[in-house]
Amino acid sequence: MFNEVILIGKLVDKPHLRETQQGIKMATMVLQVERPYRNNLGIRETDYINCILWRSIANQVSDCCEIGSFIGVKGRLQSR
């Protein structure tokens, strides 16, 4: 089995940066992703994907990305 996903979309809000109790940096963010096809009415639907970033990438995205920035995310899916 293989669990890998790549998303490209717009940053909806500024990432929320914090630390775990063990001192590991993490950030949460929402990515707005357009579907690659149109529905029956000819409209592209949009999904809002909650993402969690860890360690140095959490710092980088929090420092460098603004609301509305197009960014790419590569990771895995996990149910919570």
Where are these regions (language model features)?
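Single-stranded nucleic acid-binding surfaces, predominantly the OB-fold ssDNA-binding core
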Residues: 1-80
